[in-house]
Amino acid sequence: MSLATEGLIITQTKIRKRGMISYKTRKRLTPLLYVAPATFLFCLLMLFPMITVLRYSLMDGAIMKKDAAFVGLRNYVTIFADPVFWQSVGQTLYFTVMSVIFHLLIGLAFALLLNTQRVHPAIRSILRVLYILPWLFTAVIIAIIWRLILDPNGVVNSILMTLHIVSFKVEWFSSTKTALHALTFANIWAGYPLYMVSLLAGLQGIPKDLYEAAGIDGANEFQKFRYITIPQLMPIIISIALLDFIWTMQVFPLVWMTTGGGPIHATEVLSTYTYKLAFSSYEFSQASASAIFILILSMSATYFYIKHQKAR
């Protein structure tokens, strides 16, 4: 073989190898190109704002001062020393826990009613539309509806006074004794359809053979519900409850449009507390510290949600 031929073969081999390397590189990079837009948006809309808020929480007079000084954890110490902050934490937990519990109970009850064969299909169709109505309204509309219903001259007080249950007009959203309970009730009404739809889908996915076998073994309706229905629905219940906990803990529009955190901080939750620090008191550094606290709570709940999803 001549030297020219050997050189040609070597050159072709190098070109082929270069092409193979290029192909392998493209194969590795192609998936990254698909996720690049989502990664860019995540960094732009999520990661960058979180880092910015964390930086503000460690500074004095962030945004308001041109040369804001680094103060470490002083803003956290300040809000932790504020009684209103801890009041808002307690009220947030009450608002969230009560909402999640009653969302589950009401959603499960309505799902069972819509799934039963004892109710005529036409009636079930009507009930399905009625029960899902709260989902059709925005938070602003829901706030307006309940402000009208629970107005001192509204329909609730009229009914209660007609039935002689109360002898005076109750200030549902203006009294420190009733405001938080009324607000929680409004949020419960707005949020149960998510559970109803999810649990109804779960009920319809349970094999009928399980109930038939349990009936043959002599199980009554309560035993079927306890030992078949609930265990089959438990993965859905846990997933929805954790998501609902995260969402409810961050509720802002409904609270702001009904009570604004009042009266006298009676319905102050973490979201309204943070908003007032930022846009009423212009304490952006302290508001950032409060926002980081909310983020930590949300991330803790998210951790349990992801752990549960992996276990499934």
Where are these regions (language model features)?
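Short, Lys/Arg-rich, polar N-terminal cytosolic tail immediately upstream
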Residues: 1-25
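A structural signal for multi-pass alpha-helical bundles of membrane permease subunits
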Residues: 27-312
